[in-house]
């Protein structure tokens, strides 16, 4: 309940309508709470530096607060990569081999992975749908592209300095696996920090702004 009123008058109660159902908020929160320890055991805490994992976690407060800015920020940051993940995954599932050649979803078909880890990794299928639904309900905040660019510029160097090339988190050591060797690591990182906003964030921004901006 929110209190509103006019000058010189007592405030009156005004009902605040929640735009997102608890039937979405509660199951999603439970899903993330179960996923976190499974991922921690299987891949370690560094795995949560993936931009998709950052978005997965950030959507918990975004859902409960119905926060348009945070939702928009996560959508502009991961929507296109998540769609690419789904394309790679379903093509591999149907054909049985890596069609795209980036080995982005190979881990989903490795027998040594914990079955629960593979199951919860299917959040990549659900996450873009959730993001688009929330943007549809809340609208798109055009400031998101600037904030997400700053986040990317902070997160990518952290991944480069604090994680192993073997993990190649956020592909800071090369596109796909194995890591690239054609230029020096720092130069490649700099190129990636410029390319990600240009080829991922800005196109997603224009698409979301055209489709969902209410201003």
Where are these predicted regions, by residue range?
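Alpha-helical transmembrane segments in multipass membrane proteins, preferentially the mid-helix core
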Residues: 121-144
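Interfacial segments of alpha-helical transmembrane regions
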Residues: 62-81, 139-152
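A basic- and aromatic-enriched beta-loop-alpha substructure that forms the phosphate/nucleotide-
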Residues: 75-114
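Aromatic-anchored segments of alpha-helical transmembrane domains
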Residues: 30-37, 79-88, 151-163
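Short, hydrophobic transmembrane alpha-helix segments
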Residues: 37-46
């Amino acid at each position: 309940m929110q209190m509103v009123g006019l000058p010189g008058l007592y405030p009156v109660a005004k009902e605040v309508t929640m735009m997102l159902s608890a039937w979405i908020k509660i199951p999603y929160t439970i899903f993330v709470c179960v996923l976190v320890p499974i991922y921690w055991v299987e891949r370690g805490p560094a795995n949560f530096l993936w931009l998709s994992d950052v978005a997965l976690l950030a959507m918990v407060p975004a859902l409960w607060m119905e926060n348009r800015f945070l939702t928009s920020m996560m959508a502009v940051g991961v929507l296109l990569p998540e769609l690419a993940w789904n394309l790679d995954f379903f093509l591999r599932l149907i054909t049985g081999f890596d069609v795209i050649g980036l080995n982005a979803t190979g881990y989903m078909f490795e027998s040594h992975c914990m079955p629960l880890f593979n199951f919860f990794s299917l959040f990549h299928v659900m996450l873009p749908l959730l993001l688009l639904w929330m943007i549809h309900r809340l609208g798109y905040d055009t400031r998101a592209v600037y904030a997400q660019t700053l986040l990317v510029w902070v997160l990518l160097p952290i991944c480069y300095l604090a994680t192993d090339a073997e993990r190649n988190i956020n592909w800071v050591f090369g596109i796909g696996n194995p890591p690239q060797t054609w230029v020096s690591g720092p130069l490649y990182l700099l190129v990636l920090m410029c390319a990600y906003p240009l080829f991922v964030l800005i196109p997603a921004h224009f698409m979301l702004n055209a489709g969902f901006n209410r201003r």
